[in-house]
UniProtKB/Swiss-Prot annotation:
Residues 1-21 are annotated as: Disordered. Keywords: Bacterial flagellum biogenesis, Bacterial flagellum protein export, Cell membrane, Membrane, Protein transport, Transmembrane, Transmembrane helix, Transport. Disulfide bonds: none annotated. The gene is flhB. Its main location: membrane. Required for formation of the rod structure in the basal body of the flagellar apparatus. Together with FliI and FliH, may constitute the export apparatus of flagellin. It comes from the Bacteria. It is found in: Cell membrane. InterPro entries: FlhB, T3SS_substrate_exporter, T3SS_substrate_exporter_C. This is Flagellar biosynthetic protein FlhB. The chain crosses the membrane at residues 35-55, 89-109, 153-173, 187-207. It comes from Buchnera aphidicola subsp. Schizaphis graminum (strain Sg).
């Protein structure tokens, strides 16, 4: 039997691997979502306080352009007046920037937790490697980021130009109004333009959130070799070994159950054992066991098979032999080829019957199992 070594990251990550991954500062939180939240809440804050901001700005502008000879002849008065205006500007925008800082900090903490990553501060000469830098520069991740940035720039430009073109004359005639009306109308023009930009960016943010989730979990996945290496690294503690073994069993069982819909046939005991077989004549040298179980697991395999329209056939001695002498992901033992071939031939006849109709093919009877593989010692079913 051939055993292909597959080094693709197909295994679910262990708890230890997830912790190490998070320590590196990796997170599934979308920066695009954070930017959108900043824009939404920042604009909302400006909208709620627009009248007070406009009033204070009008006061500052009026006092700034008001000519006063006493101020000009006294240098101290000039300094005091300057700091007075600075203070007024800070008072006007302090609530806005305070709220904005909270929005910048709080969402990443809620979604990703508090992380202090000092790894990037360490001196690493490998970063000076030109080939490594070029490889990173032309990576798929960089391409995705470039595509997102270009798309955002295109959307923002189109919306801004279109909106300003529509309201061109309204903006042009702002200079003919009094200062209060001009500031308020100008604020409204900018605000509604930003609302349209937010609506245009929402699809990009949604796609980025799903992309971040998929990319994060893809990076988290491990190869068989990584799991073995981690097990060797941490095998000093019996509790950790037991926990890792348990996690590996859970991961294997989940993957096994998810593979059941791919099976061609389920061979059962009928209630104590269930073995799911798959055979691709173009890709496989022999039928392969993709799932097996006893008790509750066997019943679950049969339930999934019924739900997906997979053929189920009862052959107690063959089911016991396959369970005992076969491993998940491996080909069946050579001595069982003949027995399994009879069942697969029946499965193919059933598939043909479903397509063309006619007489339903009779199930194979007296499926023989070699005595050396017969678990209970019976010769036939």
């Amino acid at each position: 039997m051939n055993h292909d070594i597959n080094e693709e990251k197909t295994e679910q990550p262990t708890e230890h691997h997830i912790k190490k991954f998070r320590k590196k500062g990796e997170t599934r939180y979308s920066r695009e979502l954070n930017s959108l939240l900043i824009l939404i809440f920042g604009l909302s804050n400006l909208w709620w306080s627009r009248y007070s901001i406009i009033f204070e700005l009008k006061t500052i502008m009026f006092n700034s352009f008001n000519f006063n000879q006493n101020i000009l002849t006294n240098q101290q008065n000039i300094s005091l007046n300057f700091f007075f205006f600075i203070k007024k500007i800070l008072i006007v925008f302090f609530p806005f920037f305070s709220f904005l800082i909270c929005i910048i900090i709080i969402p990443p903490i809620l979604f990703g937790g508090i992380k202090f990553n000092f790894t990037s501060l360490k001196l690493n000469f490998a970063r000076l490697n030109l080939l490594h830098g070029l490889k990173k520069f032309f990576s798929f991740q960089i391409f995705i980021e470039l595509f997102k940035t270009t798309l955002k720039l295109f959307i923002i430009s189109c919306i801004s130009i279109f909106y300003l073109w529509i309201y061109f004359y309204k903006i042009l005639f702002l200079s003919t109004k009094n200062i209060s009306s001009s500031l308020l109308d100008g604020f409204n023009v900018i605000f509604y333009c930003c609302i349209l930009i937010i609506l245009g960016l929402i699809p990009i943010v949604i796609l980025d959130v799903f992309w971040r989730q998929w990319s994060y979990y893809k990076k988290l996945k491990m190869t068989h070799q990584e799991i073995k290496d981690e097990f060797k690294e941490r095998e000093g503690s019996p509790q950790i070994k037991a926990r890792i073994r348990q996690q590996m069993k859970i991961n294997l069982r989940r993957r096994m159950i998810s593979d059941v819909p791919k099976a061609d046939v389920i061979i059962t005991n009928p209630i104590h054992y269930a073995i799911a077989l798959k055979y691709d004549i173009h890709k496989m040298n022999a039928p392969k066991v993709i799932a097996k179980g006893i008790g509750a697991t066997a019943m679950k395999i049969q339930k999934i098979a019924l739900k997906n329209g997979i053929a189920i056939i009862a052959s107690p001695s063959l089911a016991r032999a396959l369970y005992r002498y076969s491993e998940i992901g491996q080909y069946i033992p050579g001595p069982l080829y003949k027995a399994v071939a009879e069942i697969l031939a029946w499965v193919w006849k059933v598939k043909k019957w479903k397509r063309e109709g006619g007489i339903f093919p009779e199930k194979p009877k007296n499926i023989s199992v070699p005595s050396e593989l017969n678990v209970t010692g019976e010769s036939n079913d």
